[in-house]
Structure formats: structure tokens, C-alpha cells
């Protein structure tokens, strides 16, 4: 390790130590992810519950501290951004609360800001052939997470929908078997909360064969002599077709004298007329001629001027007369060709052109005229009153106005100086937005639309309501005897107060259509039926509702006759049945109490007798002058959570004495000896709480808080001394309890334990390294402290004991040491070894540049090389092999549960910060927080943990190392999807891209479904060693 590397990693240490500091405060209000229209304002709220200390709030944007200005500023603890810009403001925002007294700080979860915008749209051709026309509407814009982008397609001016051969598929338009009816200009529009745009250029589709049909000519008709030799062919040809270019020009004396005015500006609602004066020569009056008006190229109106039969417009308009609809406002005058409008509307705006069409000739067209409409100021649609749900995060009331020029929209509230209340704002589109709806938002709000035409307004009533809920829902099915009484409860809460309506078999019940002597509708909504009849059986529904909505619950009423097993009522009526039920209940309760008291007395007597025998036995074994190690047998009662040995492989080796005792006494005696032995072991681990200092909370685990602190160097014992003392006590305990045990058996057991502790390392090397650290006088040891807060939680206590036994039994430089246990008072403290660089995941994030570690005059540390990653993986494999040889399982192996020192030494640890810091990496499954993305399938399905499941998790750890821990395994899936696919065996794993080729096969074998086919840690260590040698060459 070079001096440069140590200097760089020192900077990483400083940043990581600052990042793990956390105060005891919690956030009362957290920043929420939001989607906002570009150029609108947004506010992120942040507030801590620590009201007793002075707090300072800071905000980070994408991991960098925000530089405030007039547009981005902080008011109190909240962050305000005016005129949001998508190029600068998109990303994640984190609130940092710092306690000025202690310097501890806490970070909120990141809140994401998405910007909604829309710029342009264009039509793209994806494919065109005889069988299918495929177009796509490409949109430059984003809709955030709130509302999807809405796409509409138009053919010429006709809006398209999925019908016949036309199919709309999200952004795509599919026309199957396109024909001449599908010819035209295709355009699309896209809209979202930011606005609406139409494609500037569309796509013109023309079928491959287009010809002009010729009408059969009657014998009585004659063609003019000058055209006798003209021939009209209809021949489809690949690559082109005969069109209007092949038609002859119309006679020169057939012309339009005056067309529409080049530009007309008309107010909406006023009448107007478009002129089309034409000249028709006498020789053509018997010919088939049509006068046509077109709007934006589409045929609008037509009239026959000569001939006895109309001319088909199919030749020139492909049969699409979309604008030839009934409209009484439009009248086409045949005499002078004028197109008159009785009343102009906004949709009449466009380009108009009149034409004279002589059969089989090029049409004669006038100059186009543009009609502009001054749209009247109006609301589209009219704003309406609305009910808002109480405590809704966001509620909107729309107010859209149209007019020429575009009107400005604003909102005011009646009273209170016409100002809007807090948490109510207006966006750029005129939408009234309510945030965190409360009762103060009730009232009348007026929408004002203003332009040069004037001002219009619309007032709406906003009411804050609470959706009706069942406080006492009807519960069934209900069985009752004939002629009995039944009560069906139904009570509701809400604002306004909900009404309650009963029905039977979907027929409403009321006092008017029921027997008032038998049916009673109580004021609280309960239905009471007396003298129940057989015909009363059925399904009863209770419907509650107010202005906020409706809810309904059904219950089935079953009426039993006497023959069905119900006894007829006695003369005493209901009173006799109630009395009999009370007497039976009281008798059963009294018998239960007597039984419980008797069992308590018997257990107390047996416990005292057993303790007396144990005290006598202990006195005899110790020579009569050795006190009980557990304090006269009371240690197990004082420490109920740590009184039993729950290590699955540690079994009592005590043998029964020669005394003839009953089987239950023998079992109780062996259990008591095991408890005394376990308590004696915990006494050896005892540490005074006063030896701990500078405790700083870094998070919360499965059974309590987790701290980082310092332990006095005088309390740190050498691992060799600790092991020798422990083995000596084990030997004495076994020799004392098993009078006939041999010394050779004890010696072989100790040797076996020593071998399990050394694993693949030399025990003398461990002693020399750790003894050197211990002899450095005047230094304090950095430790990790895990508190046992849930003393009464049996599952938490069992896991606490399991981790104690795991770390106590292993002495290996790849696994953190257990320094001791503080049991002087609650909560109990488990004191573990900790390193100066902290947990491995934060180290990987820092080297990947995901954590800002740079200080003044320095840069972020470089990413790890492949050789360094392999070295880390190798050290973890050696530590896990030691755990395997000690016949333990880890169950939560991940980079977050490993620590790394400034000497680049990695150790397997067990912080397990599953409640806050790494809560995203845990999921509650079967009422237990599990790291499901690291667990083997058998752990999730059958709760079966073995060394092979640790192998599975190790493969995920190597995947984390090569990805620098920058992403979660299968982060594209939700936790529920991971559980489902893991149980179904369909969760697919792949190694990281930077993984060496020599490791890919063995790492993939870590994730096979059959645990027996997975490799061992020793095989993984050998493969990693070879890979390290290859990487160094």
C-alpha cells in the first residue's frame, strides 16, 4: 500500500465517518417526489421532530450542496424552486438536518423531481406496403410519473379512432390493407399537463393505383369535335399511376371571375359570405359541371350546375367527404356560387377555395382566401364545484378559457382580501392546485379570464369531505332460529355524516315497505328484526354514502327452523337463554382460574425442590465452600434473555449421576446445568459499561440500536488468552459434570475447536498481529455496539444469542472479534470489533464517486482495480470459510455487513442496519425483515439456512464488488416480484460485466437452484487466488 493510496483512503474515512453520524431525531415531514410543469414553482418540505435542540437544515441536489440564488432558495427548512428548468433542476433532492449542539446529522430519503414539458411532434414512417401502413408519432417531451402522454391522430381534418382497418397502438398508427379511402395527409397531436402540440409536417399517403373512372356515355350524347380523338386509359403501373397530370385542361371560357377575399377577419357569432362568381359558356351548359368549395383542401360543399346527373367526387377526393356533414349554418348558392355562414364559429377558421369541375378535365380553381375568426372569450368547459378528500396530497380544479387573443387566467377566493389560503396555488395553465387538503380550504373560489375583449368569471364551491367508512360493518353470515330476534349492525363515519340504506336481495327496505312491528331501523344504522320468519332469509346489504362517495357491505341471514337443530323458545323467552349462557360462561371461567392457580403452585414447589437439590450437588462438587456462579441459582431469572444456550450444534455433554431419579427430574437437572454453563460463559464475556465512551448512533438493527464508540485499551483482551481461558473453563465444566469422562476426549475436543478457529490461517500469525495491537498502550479500540432493546421479544433474543455464539466461537482475522457483553443494566450491549474505514458498501460507493468525499484541494478516490476487488473477495471468502468450519451460518452476508480498515483488511461483521440506513435492502416476508435479494430460494420458501445459502449470498457479494455497490441486485424488480420469481425458480442471475472470465463459471454455480451443486468456500478461495495471480501478471 503506497503513501498516496493511504492518503486518498484517509479522505474516504473522513467523509464516511461524517456520513454515519446520526442524531436521535426523526423526520416529521419528509420531502416527497414530485412532477411539475416546466417554468412552474415547486416546494420540498422537510421538518425534524427534534424540537429540543437547535437544528440547521441543508439541501443536496444529486449529491451536491445547492448554491442558492433568487430562483432557488431556502425558507426555513423548506426548499423553494421558482420557474423550474428541466436542464438544471431534474434529479434527487436530500434534506440534511444537523444538530448544532452535538454536530450529529441525519439525511432524509431522496425525493425525485420530474419536469413535465412538451416541445414538438413529428410523424415518422415505420413501414408501408400493400398490406399495412405503419406510422409513429415522435414527441419531444416528458410527462413525468403523474399522467401519460395523450396522442391523437388525424387524417386530413378527420380525427381517427380504432375502427375497421385502423388501429391506434400508443404512439403508433396502423392501417391494415390500405386503399384509396385511406389516402390523405396524416398528422398527430400530443398533449400533457404542459400543453398540446401538433406535428408541423405530416405524412401524405397515396395508394399505388389511382385512376379516374369514366362514365358510360349515352348514344344520344355527343362530344365536342375538338376532343374526339382524346383517349382516357386506366392502367395501374408499378412505381406510378395515371393522375390529374394526364387530364386535359378545361376550356378557357369556363372560368371563375371573382373568388374569396384573400384575408377576412370575422368575429365569432357574426354572419359572413365567401364570393365565387363564375362564367359558364352556353355550349357547356348541358355538360356535367360541379361548383365545389374546399376548406384546407377538403371538400366542404358542392352543387350541380349543368347536366342531368351529378359527377362523382371519388376521382379527386378518394371518397373521403369528411366535411360534407349536415350544418344548417352553411348555404351554397347555385346562382352566384356564394358560400354563406349564418353564424361563424371558431372551427370555421381556415383556407377556402372554390372550384369548377368539368367531367374528365382539370378543375378550374380560384385564388385561396383565408378566414380568420376572432374567438369569443369563454370558458371551455365551464368550471364546476368539486368535493376534495380531506388530507389528499394533491387536488386540482381546472379552469380553461379560450378567446382571441389568448386570455390570462387567475383565481381569487371570496373574502379574506381575495387571497388564496396557504398550500393553494395556480399553475401556468390556470389550474387551481390544493396541496395537503384541510378544512381551511373550504369556500367559494372565482376563476377570472381576461383579454382585450374584457373579463369573464365563474365561481365554484370547494367542499372538503371525508369518504364514508364503516365504523361497525355488518359481519356474517348470521344464523338465527325462527321466531327469534336478530340484530345486524351497520355504523358509519364520514363528513358530511353518511346516510345508511338497507336492502334485502337488492330491494330497498324502509319503514314504508316493511312490517313496522318486526323491522326496526335504529338511529345509528343498525337493523333489528323481531319474530324472524323463514321468508326473512336472504342477503342483506348496507349502503353508506355522502357527497364523497358510496360503500356497501353484504351479510347473509340464515333462518333455521326447529327441525334444523334449533330448540324452540321456552316460556321465559330471551331472558332464559341469556341467563343460561351467562351461567355456563362463568362456570368455565372459574374452572380455568382454579386450574391455572393449581399449576402455578405445583410448578413453584417443583422449582424450589429442584433448586435445593442443585445447591446440594454444587456444594458437594466444589468442596462445600464454592459459591454458585450464578448467584444462588438466580442468574437465569435475572437474565431471562441470555439464560439458555440456543446454539444448534452445542449440546450438553453432562451425564446423569448414579442417583436414581425420575425422568422429568433428570431432564430438568440437565437443562439447569446447561443454563448455568451458558450463564458462566456470558460472565466471562462481561465488560463494564463505563469502559465505553463516545457512543454515536449509526442506525437501528433487528433487535435494537447500533452505535460506534471507543473501548478502553485495558479492557481489550488478547484472543489467545481469551481462548485459553474459555477452553479451560469448558474442560473444568465437563470434567466436573461428567464424572466418568476421559481426559483424552476433552483434549481431542479442544484440538478440534482450535482447528475450526484457525481455518486457512496460522493461529500464531493471528496471535502476533493482534497482540501487537493490544500492546499499544494509551490507545482506545474502535468498536461497534449492538443494543438489545427488545428484551421481551423471544425471536429478537434468540437472534441476539445466535450472533453472540457465532462471534464468540470464531477467532480469525477475516471475522470481527467479540470483545464482550455489557449486562449491568438494560439494554444489553454486544461489543464488536470495528475498523477505521467503516462498512464495505460505503467504501465502494465512495471509490465509485457516488459519495462526495472530496475536500478542499483534493479529489475523489479512484475506483478499485480488478486486483483490489479480487483481494477483497478473497478475504471475505476466507472469513466465511472460518464460519463454515466452526459449523455456523451467517444468514445476512452482504457488503453492508463487512468492514474494511485503512490497511485494506476486510472482515466479515454483522451490523445489519435493516431499520433505517439500509432499509431498502430488506423486505418484510412472513413478519420477518429479510434481505431477499441476497437469499437463496430455499431460505425464502422453507426458511432453511445452510452454508450453501451463504454461498448463494457470497455470489451476490462478488456481484456487488464488481459493480462498486452502485445498484441493487435486480433493482428493476419490486420486492414482491423478487419473492415470487425466487419461489417459482424463474429469477435469473448473471455475473457483472467486469468479472474475469476465469471466475464466471464458478460464480454462476453459486446461484444454481440445487444447493448440493454449489461450490464450497475453499473452492471459491482457490479460484480467487488463481485469478489474483493472473491479474498481477
Curated annotation (Swiss-Prot):
SUPFAM superfamilies cross-referenced by the UniProt entry: Immunoglobulin, Protein kinase-like (PK-like)
S-S bridge residues: 46-95, 137-188, 276-354, 399-447, 490-542
Chain positions found as Phosphoserine: 678
Alphabetized Gene3D superfamilies for the sequence: Immunoglobulins, Transferase(Phosphotransferase) domain 1
GO MF annotation list: ATP binding; cell adhesion molecule binding; protein heterodimerization activity; protein homodimerization activity; protein kinase activity; signaling receptor activity; transmembrane receptor protein tyrosine kinase activity; Wnt-protein binding
Keywords: Cell adhesion, Cell membrane, Disulfide bond, Glycoprotein, Immunoglobulin domain, Membrane, Neurogenesis, Phosphoprotein, Receptor, Repeat, Signal, Transmembrane, Transmembrane helix
Cellular-component GO terms for this entry: axon; plasma membrane; receptor complex
Topology feature Cytoplasmic, residues: 603-1033
Domain named Protein kinase: residues: 692-1028
Main location (coarse class): membrane
Glycosylation sites: 39, 336, 417, 429, 444, 457, 512, 524
Positions of the UniProt region annotated as Disordered: 617-679, 718-760
Location(s) in or outside the cell: Cell membrane
Subunit relationships: Interacts with plexA; component of a receptor complex that mediates the repulsive signaling in response to Semaphorin ligands.
Family stated for the protein in its record: Belongs to the protein kinase superfamily. Tyr protein kinase family. Insulin receptor subfamily.
Protein name per its UniProtKB record: Tyrosine-protein kinase-like otk
Species whose genome carries this gene: Drosophila yakuba
Lineage of producing organism: Eukaryota, Metazoa, Ecdysozoa, Arthropoda, Hexapoda
Gene symbol of the encoding locus: otk
Amino acid at each position: 500500500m503506497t503513501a498516496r493510496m493511504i492518503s486518498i483512503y484517509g479522505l474516504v474515512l473522513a467523509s464516511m465517518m461524517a456520513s454515519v453520524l446520526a442524531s436521535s431525531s426523526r423526520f416529521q415531514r419528509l420531502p416527497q417526489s414530485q412532477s411539475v410543469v416546466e417554468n412552474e414553482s415547486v416546494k420540498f418540505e422537510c421538518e425534524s421532530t427534534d424540537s429540543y435542540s437547535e437544528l440547521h437544515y441543508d439541501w443536496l441536489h444529486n449529491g451536491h450542496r445547492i448554491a442558492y440564488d433568487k430562483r432557488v432558495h431556502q425558507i426555513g427548512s423548506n426548499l423553494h424552486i421558482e420557474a423550474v428548468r428541466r436542464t438544471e433542476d431534474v434529479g434527487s433532492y436530500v434534506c440534511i438536518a444537523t444538530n448544532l449542539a452535538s454536530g450529529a446529522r441525519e439525511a432524509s430519503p431522496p425525493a425525485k423531481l420530474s419536469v413535465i414539458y412538451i416541445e414538438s411532434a413529428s410523424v415518422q414512417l415505420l413501414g408501408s406496403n400493400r398490406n399495412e401502413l405503419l406510422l409513429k408519432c415522435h414527441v419531444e417531451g416528458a410527462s413525468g410519473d403523474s399522467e401519460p402522454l395523450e396522442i391523437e391522430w388525424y387524417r386530413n381534418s378527420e380525427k381517427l379512432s380504432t375502427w375497421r382497418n385502423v388501429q391506434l397502438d400508443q404512439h403508433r398508427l396502423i392501417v391494415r390493407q390500405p386503399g384509396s379511402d385511406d389516402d390523405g395527409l396524416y398528422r398527430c397531436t400530443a398533449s400533457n399537463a404542459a400543453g398540446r402540440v401538433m406535428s408541423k409536417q405530416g405524412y401524405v399517403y397515396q395508394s399505388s393505383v389511382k385512376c379516374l373512372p369514366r362514365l358510360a356515355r349515352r348514344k344520344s350524347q355527343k362530344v365536342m369535335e375538338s376532343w374526339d380523338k382524346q383517349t382516357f386509359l386506366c392502367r395501374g403501373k408499378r412505381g406510378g399511376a395515371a393522375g390529374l397530370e394526364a387530364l386535359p385542361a378545361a376550356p378557357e371560357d369556363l372560368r371563375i371571375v371573382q373568388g374569396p377575399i384573400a384575408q377576412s377577419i370575422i368575429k365569432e357569432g357574426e354572419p359572413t359570405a365567401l364570393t365565387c362568381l363564375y362564367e359558364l359558356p352556353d355550349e357547356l351548359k348541358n355538360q356535367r359541371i360541379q361548383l365545389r368549395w374546399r376548406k384546407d383542401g377538403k371538400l366542404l360543399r358542392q352543387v350541380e350546375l349543368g347536366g342531368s346527373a351529378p359527377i362523382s367526387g371519388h376521382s379527386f377526393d378518394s371518397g373521403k367527404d369528411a366535411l360534407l356533414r349536415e350544418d344548417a349554418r352553411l348555404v351554397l348558392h347555385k346562382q352566384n356560387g356564394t358560400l354563406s355562414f349564418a353564424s361563424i364559429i371558431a372551427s370555421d377558421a381556415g383556407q377556402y377555395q372554390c372550384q369548377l369541375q368539368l367531367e374528365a378535365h382539370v378543375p378550374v380553381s380560384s385564388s385561396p382566401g383565408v378566414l380568420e375568426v376572432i374567438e369569443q372569450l369563454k370558458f371551455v368547459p365551464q368550471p364546476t364545484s368539486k368535493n376534495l378528500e380531506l388530507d389528499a396530497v394533491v387536488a386540482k380544479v381546472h379552469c380553461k378559457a379560450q378567446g382571441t387573443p389568448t386570455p390570462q387566467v387567475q383565481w381569487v377566493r371570496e373574502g379574506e382580501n381575495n387571497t388564496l389560503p396557504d398550500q393553494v396555488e395556480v399553475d401556468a395553465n390556470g389550474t387551481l392546485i390544493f396541496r395537503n387538503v384541510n378544512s381551511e380550504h373550504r369556500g367559494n373560489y372565482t376563476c377570472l379570464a381576461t383579454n382585450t375583449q374584457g373579463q369573464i368569471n365563474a365561481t365554484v364551491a370547494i367542499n372538503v369531505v371525508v369518504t364514508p367508512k364503516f365504523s361497525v360493518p355488518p359481519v356474517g353470515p348470521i344464523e338465527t332460529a325462527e321466531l327469534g330476534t336478530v340484530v345486524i349492525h351497520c355504523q358509519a363515519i364520514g363528513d358530511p355524516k353518511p346516510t345508511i340504506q338497507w336492502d334485502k336481495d337488492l330491494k330497498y327496505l324502509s319503514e314504508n315497505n316493511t312490517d313496522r312491528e318486526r323491522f326496526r331501523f335504529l338511529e345509528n344504522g343498525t337493523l333489528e328484526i323481531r319474530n324472524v320468519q323463514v321468508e326473512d332469509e336472504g342477503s342483506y346489504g348496507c349502503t353508506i354514502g355522502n357527497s364523497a362517495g358510496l360503500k356497501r357491505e353484504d351479510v347473509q341471514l340464515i333462518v333455521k327452523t326447529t327441525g334444523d337443530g334449533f330448540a324452540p323458545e321456552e316460556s321465559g323467552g330471551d331472558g332464559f337463554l341469556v341467563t343460561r349462557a351467562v351461567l355456563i360462561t362463568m362456570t368455565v371461567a372459574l374452572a380455568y382460574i382454579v386450574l391455572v392457580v393449581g399449576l402455578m403452585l405445583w410448578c413453584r414447589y417443583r422449582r424450589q425442590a429442584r433448586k435445593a437439590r442443585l445447591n446440594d450437588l454444587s456444594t458437594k462438587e466444589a468442596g462445600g465452600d464454592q459459591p454458585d456462579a450464578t448467584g444462588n441459582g438466580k442468574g437465569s431469572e435475572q437474565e431471562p434473555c441470555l439464560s439458555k444456550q440456543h446454539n444448534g450444534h452445542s449440546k450438553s455433554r453432562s451425564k446423569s449421576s448414579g442417583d436414581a431419579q425420575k425422568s422429568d427430574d433428570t431432564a430438568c437437572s440437565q437443562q439447569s446445568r446447561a443454563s448455568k454453563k451458558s450463564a458462566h460463559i456470558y460472565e466471562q464475556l462481561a465488560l463494564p459499561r463505563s469502559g465505553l465512551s463516545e457512543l454515536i448512533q449509526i442506525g437501528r438493527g433487528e433487535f435494537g440500536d447500533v452505535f460506534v464508540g471507543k473501548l478502553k485499551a485495558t479492557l481489550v483482551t488478547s484472543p489467545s488468552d481469551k481462548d485459553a481461558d474459555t477452553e479451560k473453563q469448558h474442560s473444568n465444566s465437563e470434567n466436573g459434570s461428567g464424572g466418568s469422562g476421559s481426559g483424552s476426549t476433552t483434549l481431542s475436543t479442544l484440538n478440534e475447536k482450535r482447528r475450526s478457529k484457525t481455518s486457512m490461517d496460522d493461529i500464531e500469525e493471528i496471535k502476533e498481529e493482534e497482540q501487537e495491537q493490544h500492546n499499544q498502550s494509551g490507545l482506545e479500540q474502535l468498536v461497534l455496539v449492538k443494543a438489545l432493546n427488545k428484551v421481551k421479544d423471544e425471536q429478537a433474543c434468540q437472534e441476539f444469542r445466535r450472533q453472540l455464539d457465532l462471534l464468540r466461537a470464531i477467532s480469525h482475522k477475516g471475522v470481527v472479534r467479540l470483545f464482550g457483553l455489557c449486562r449491568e443494566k438494560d439494554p444489553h450491549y454486544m461489543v464488536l470489533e470495528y475498523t477505521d474505514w467503516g462498512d464495505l458498501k460505503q467504501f465502494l460507493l465512495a471509490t465509485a464517486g457516488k459519495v462526495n468525499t472530496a475536500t478542499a484541494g483534493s479529489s475523489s478516490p479512484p475506483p478499485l482495480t480488478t486486483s483490489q476487488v479480487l483481494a477483497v473477495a478473497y478475504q471475505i471468502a476466507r472469513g466465511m470459510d472460518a464460519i463454515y468450519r466452526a459449523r455456523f451460518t451467517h444468514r445476512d452476508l452482504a457488503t453492508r455487513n463487512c468492514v474494511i480498515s485503512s490497511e485494506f483488511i476486510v472482515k466479515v461483521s454483522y451490523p445489519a442496519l435493516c431499520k433505517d440506513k439500509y432499509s431498502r435492502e430488506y423486505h418484510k416476508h412472513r413478519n420477518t425483515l429479510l434481505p431477499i435479494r441476497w437469499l437463496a430460494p430455499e431460505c425464502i420458501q422453507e426458511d432453511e439456512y445452510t452454508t450453501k445459502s451463504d454461498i448463494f449470498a457470497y455470489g451476490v457479494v462478488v456481484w456487488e464488488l464488481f459493480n462498486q455497490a452502485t445498484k441493487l441486485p435486480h433493482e428493476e424488480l419490486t420486492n414482491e416480484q423478487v419473492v415470487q420469481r425466487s419461489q417459482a425458480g424463474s429469477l435469473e442471475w448473471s455475473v457483472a460485466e467486469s468479472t474475469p472470465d476465469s471466475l464466471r463459471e464458478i460464480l454462476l454455480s453459486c446461484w444454481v437452484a440445487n444447493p448440493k451443486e454449489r461450490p464450497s468456500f475453499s473452492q471459491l478461495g482457490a479460484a480467487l487466488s488463481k485469478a489474483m495471480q493472473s491479474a498481477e501478471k
